């Protein structure tokens, strides 16, 4: 999803606990178990992306679920799956 001059990266896109039918875009092997917005921000900083954080917004299909709270607009023209895969991999490295 392209928005506000970049790509919108919702937490659910990389969350292992969210099924693909509900919004996850990565395969289970690449997804991260219950990522936080802070982890996503650290990963984006480490990868050198420019971004804007929106912590109080909920992913519309999962408006009732706290896992779906928060997104980041990444200032890039890369494809969403590529960005999501890089961020998920970096979060795994940060976690150890």
UniProtKB/Swiss-Prot annotation:
Part of the signal recognition particle protein translocation system, which is composed of SRP and FtsY. Archaeal SRP consists of a 7S RNA molecule of 300 nucleotides and two protein subunits: SRP54 and SRP19. It comes from Pyrobaculum arsenaticum (strain DSM 13514 / JCM 11321 / PZ6). Belongs to the SRP19 family. It is found in: Cytoplasm. This is Signal recognition particle 19 kDa protein. Involved in targeting and insertion of nascent membrane proteins into the cytoplasmic membrane. Binds directly to 7S RNA and mediates binding of the 54 kDa subunit of the SRP. InterPro entries: Signal_recog_particle_SRP19, SRP19-like_sf, SRP19_arc-type. SUPFAM superfamilies: SRP19 (SSF69695). Signal peptide: none annotated. Keywords: Cytoplasm, Ribonucleoprotein, RNA-binding, Signal recognition particle. GO terms for cellular component: signal recognition particle. GO terms for molecular function: 7S RNA binding. The lineage of its organism: Archaea, Thermoproteota, Thermoprotei, Thermoproteales, Thermoproteaceae. GO terms for biological process: SRP-dependent cotranslational protein targeting to membrane.
